[in-house]
Amino acid sequence: MRYLATLLLSLAVLITAGCGWHLRDTTQVPSTMKVMILDSGDPNGPLSRAVRNQLRLNGVELLDKETTRKDVPSLRLGKVSIAKDTASVFRNGQTAEYQMIMTVNATVLIPGRDIYPISAKVFRSFFDNPQMALAKDNEQDMIVKEMYDRAAEQLIRKLPSIRAADIRSDEEQTSTTTDTPATPARVSTTLGN
């Protein structure tokens, strides 16, 4: 019986490991990005904290921005904008529901390579009850905090695609340098009369 239980447990572990299953909210960050610099205009702001938390959850070691190492990729957080649009209205014309749209722009700088822009958009809606102003403000603050967390998750999920784009550009660069034959220098056919 013990042998059968061990066999079934081992089989379950192999199946989940073999199919690529991984824990929720974790991304397989490329090995070249396991050490990174997080650069932000507001290092203690909500987006910086959310991104720092997501990077640490995914096993990325963060270095100070002032580090002397220049061979480390850096994630530079850019502009964050939050727009609030009316989604529905009451009969009297007052806003009943808002849709909030958060747009986050960032760039990943890979030293000696290129700069890769990434962005994330998060949509949330919430009801506007004019009779509960304080509760509405608290709910909106909670929604904005959750939006920062979701935007950070989206940015971190895009890191593997940046690595793939970097590899693809390397392959294109090597194929163009090795496949094209050398052309002779251009000779002018006109005489300087």
From Swiss-Prot:
It is a lipid-anchor. Keywords: Cell outer membrane, Lipoprotein, Membrane, Palmitate, Signal. One of its GO terms (cellular component) is cell outer membrane. Residues 174-186 have a biased composition (Low complexity). A lipid is attached at residue 19 (S-diacylglycerol cysteine). Residues 166-193 are annotated as: Disordered. GO terms for molecular function: lipopolysaccharide binding. Together with LptD, is involved in the assembly of lipopolysaccharide (LPS) at the surface of the outer membrane. Required for the proper assembly of LptD. Binds LPS and may serve as the LPS recognition site at the outer membrane. This is LPS-assembly lipoprotein LptE.
